Amino acid sequence: MGAVFISGRESAVWLNKHLANDIGSLAIEQAHYSFLLNDGGGVIDDLIIYRLAEDVFFVVPNASGVDAVMAHLIGCIGEADVRLENRSGSVVSIAVQGSMAESLMQSIFPEIGFDRLKKNDLKLVDGKSDSMILARTGYTGSDGFEIFTDIEEGRALWERLLNNNSGVECHVCGLGSRDTLRIEAGYPLYGNELNTSLTPIQAGLGFFVGAELKQTLKEQFPNNLPKVVYFKVLEKAPPPRNGYEIFEGESSIGKVTSGCLSPLTGEGIGFALVNSKISLNESEKYSIFIRNRKYSLMFVKRGIIYS
């Protein structure tokens, strides 16, 4: 993940002009999910904003999006009293996720009352060289925490987590497991469900957009534009993958953007970008083309695994 620090007397007001939702509602030591948008309403990147102090923010973009985010923000500064610092090469991010995450974190940081940290809350603690950020955030759909610190301390923390004596088993997970977890939870991935050509409204994420901007986007873009929707495959089938076609009857209406077999249910699930108005919970209307045959498909509310 990226690590961009934004500070200065006008940082809050300035950020509010460039993000999709209201920074003013964010208390110190709180975080929220947002989008950096281009002039056309498309998503440059999705990111999490952490408010460390009144005029100090920590922005976490995707690792692949750091250059685009920095270029856009630098181009927007003008005369504003704002300072940007890209520390992506020196800040380590460790995501501790799962139902036992709180117990594990409590054993590593006994001085912190993690039971009092609500979702999206954060705590600044003294590290060896700088403040360490402990936040109740993550992108798996489960409870969990993220740790942001310097490389040396991150390496030591990694070993402490894996070799902890709390009785909690801690396993290393890669991006493949993160991908299935976020698909089960109905979370989008930049480059698949989000890009510079799609607005948050099209991506089905309008609830993360401030009311005024949402109205502007709705006025600027017609309802018949392609939309990101969530589906599950109704028959036993190979995993749905990016690029597989979706049909309504004999007509192709879109393609899969992300898909997998759910480890929880064994069903094929995922996201698709469709060009047509669709109906939820219709079991006989839609299909997906996988390995030279069609399988029945239903569009459902996203994140149905956890509903």
Protein language model annotation of sequence segments:
Residues 22-76:
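Well-ordered mid-protein domain cores that form the structural environment of catalytic cofactors
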Residues 52-307:
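Conserved, structured C-terminal
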Residues 9-43, 101-130:
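Internal amphipathic helical hairpin motif
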Residues 6:
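Short hydrophobic beta-strand that contains or immediately precedes a catalytic carboxylate
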